[in-house]
Amino acid sequence: MSPIFMNITLAFTISLLGMLVYRSHLMASLLCLEGMMMSLFIMIALMASNAHSPLTNIMPIILLVFAACETAVGLALLVSISNTYGLDYIHNLNLLQC
């Protein structure tokens, strides 16, 4: 395993660990999730550049689009929760309420 892939895997693992540690705060969870998506983007972009196939060149762009959608939905949820409760705790969410 090359040092670049090892560093990217380490960044993904640290972001995943941060997601597990800071799971009670929505903002910290969103930042860790964004770190995971960016490390996946870099890894897929490096693999696509080594594959020399036209079909693999579109994969990083698709992942980046999904990451942008995830960020937009997460920030909208964060703003909604902050305006309603004044806090960013995830335990304030109750999906059974209308």
Curated annotation (Swiss-Prot):
<keyword id="KW-1278">Translocase</keyword>
<dbReference type="Pfam" id="PF00420">
    <property type="entry name" value="Oxidored_q2"/>
</dbReference>
<keyword id="KW-0813">Transport</keyword>
<feature type="transmembrane region" description="Helical">
    <location>
        <begin position="26"/>
        <end position="46"/>
    </location>
</feature>
<keyword id="KW-0520">NAD</keyword>
<keyword id="KW-0830">Ubiquinone</keyword>
<feature type="transmembrane region" description="Helical">
    <location>
        <begin position="1"/>
        <end position="21"/>
    </location>
</feature>
<keyword id="KW-0812">Transmembrane</keyword>
<comment type="function">
    <text>Core subunit of the mitochondrial membrane respiratory chain NADH dehydrogenase (Complex I) which catalyzes electron transfer from NADH through the respiratory chain, using ubiquinone as an electron acceptor. Part of the enzyme membrane arm which is embedded in the lipid bilayer and involved in proton translocation.</text>
</comment>
<keyword id="KW-0496">Mitochondrion</keyword>
<dbReference type="InterPro" id="IPR039428">
    <property type="entry name" value="NUOK/Mnh_C1-like"/>
</dbReference>
<keyword id="KW-0679">Respiratory chain</keyword>
<dbReference type="GO" id="GO:0045271">
    <property type="term" value="C:respiratory chain complex I"/>
</dbReference>
<keyword id="KW-0472">Membrane</keyword>
<dbReference type="InterPro" id="IPR001133">
    <property type="entry name" value="NADH_UbQ_OxRdtase_chain4L/K"/>
</dbReference>
<feature type="transmembrane region" description="Helical">
    <location>
        <begin position="61"/>
        <end position="81"/>
    </location>
</feature>
<comment type="subunit">
    <text>Core subunit of respiratory chain NADH dehydrogenase (Complex I) which is composed of 45 different subunits.</text>
</comment>
<dbReference type="GO" id="GO:0042773">
    <property type="term" value="P:ATP synthesis coupled electron transport"/>
</dbReference>
<keyword id="KW-0999">Mitochondrion inner membrane</keyword>
<keyword id="KW-0249">Electron transport</keyword>
<protein>
    <recommendedName>
        <fullName>NADH-ubiquinone oxidoreductase chain 4L</fullName>
        <ecNumber>7.1.1.2</ecNumber>
    </recommendedName>
</protein>
<dbReference type="GO" id="GO:0005743">
    <property type="term" value="C:mitochondrial inner membrane"/>
</dbReference>
<keyword id="KW-1133">Transmembrane helix</keyword>
<comment type="similarity">
    <text>Belongs to the complex I subunit 4L family.</text>
</comment>
<dbReference type="GO" id="GO:0008137">
    <property type="term" value="F:NADH dehydrogenase (ubiquinone) activity"/>
</dbReference>
